[in-house]
Design a protein with these regions (language model features):
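Hydrophobic cores of alpha-helical transmembrane segments in multi-pass inner/ER membrane proteins
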Residues: 48-61, 139-142, 195-211
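Membrane-interface interhelical connector segments
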Residues: 97-122
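Interfacial helix-loop-helix junctions of multi-pass membrane proteins
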Residues: 97, 170-195
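Short, highly charged, low-complexity non-transmembrane loops/tails of multi-pass membrane proteins
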Residues: 216-242
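Internal alpha-helical transmembrane segments of multi-pass membrane proteins
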Residues: 138, 148-166, 222
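N-terminal signal-anchor transmembrane alpha helix
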Residues: 72-95
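Juxtamembrane "helix-exit" motif on the non-cytosolic side of transmembrane helices
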Residues: 26-38, 174-181
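Aromatic-anchored segments of alpha-helical transmembrane domains
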Residues: 21-32, 84-89, 160-171
Length: 242
């Protein structure tokens, strides 16, 4: 059977599908922000199926012996949930205390999914909005672990800051009514809040990826045998002793 350097063809294809699935939700939200379609259309047709595909692949990965995909999926659940929690702490402080945000992005996503923009949020829209927000956070962490693998913690920080930059350059800014980098709302407080929120998110995902014993190598290393772009001091002893 065809095999890459340290990755079977089956796992390589499954990883590619999982990466695409993890990318669907943020791309769908960005596309909906252009006005070409709505989240109420994309959520059941694209976002939910992609989420179910990702879950199915992560669940079947251990049974198929896909160690790399198994590790990336499990670590993404840990790093993604923790990362979103600390990110939201910063965002809420920026919103409530310093008025650096126009409102709650998860609540906005929820009313867009349920088509309740004029009526306002309810329990279902909040549930779906926050669920999608956490799924996005998990998806971005999965992409990081599946592609970049073990790196020093600050690489995760750079990755998250890049996400923040793309976010503030995207059509979502027009949907929020704040303009590029929030210059029409709070030209200093908005980008500062977004960058700080993503900074702590990146630190968490980077720290988890560096410290966990099961973090995979970078994808190019496992595919083609390229030098592993990972921390040289692999903390096996510390992690395994806990």
């Amino acid at each position: 059977m065809f095999k890459f350097h340290d990755l079977s063809l089956g796992e390589a294809l499954a990883t590619a599908v999982a990466l695409i699935a993890a990318s669907v939700s943020p791309l769908a939200f960005t596309y909906a922000a252009t006005g070409a379609t709505t989240m109420s259309v994309l959520a059941p047709r694209l976002i939910l199926p992609a989420f179910l595909v990702w879950i199915a692949l992560v669940l079947v990965a251990p049974w198929m012996g896909w160690r790399r995909l198994t590790s990336a999926g499990r670590l993404a659940l840990v790093g993604g949930v923790l990362g979103v929690i600390v990110m939201e702490v910063v965002r809420i402080i920026g919103f409530r205390v310093f008025h650096g945000m126009p409102g709650s992005l998860p609540m906005l996503i929820g009313v867009l999914i349920t088509n309740r923009f004029m009526e306002g949020p309810d329990w279902l829209s909040n549930l779906l909005g926050w669920g999608d927000h956490f799924w996005n956070g998990i998806g971005f962490v999965f992409i990081y672990y599946a592609v970049f693998g073990r790196q020093r913690w600050w690489v995760g920080m750079v990755y998250a800051l890049a996400i923040a930059t793309v976010f503030m350059l995207s059509p979502v800014m027009n949907l929020l009514g704040v303009g590029i980098f929030g210059h029409e709302f709070a030209p200093v407080k908005f980008p500062l809040t977004v960058y700080l929120a993503h900074l702590v998110y990146g630190v968490v995902l980077g720290w988890v990826g560096q410290r966990a014993a099961s973090t995979p190598n970078n994808l190019l290393s496992d595919l083609f045998g390229w030098p592993a772009l990972r921390a040289e001091s692999r903390p096996n002893a510390q992690v395994q002793s806990n």
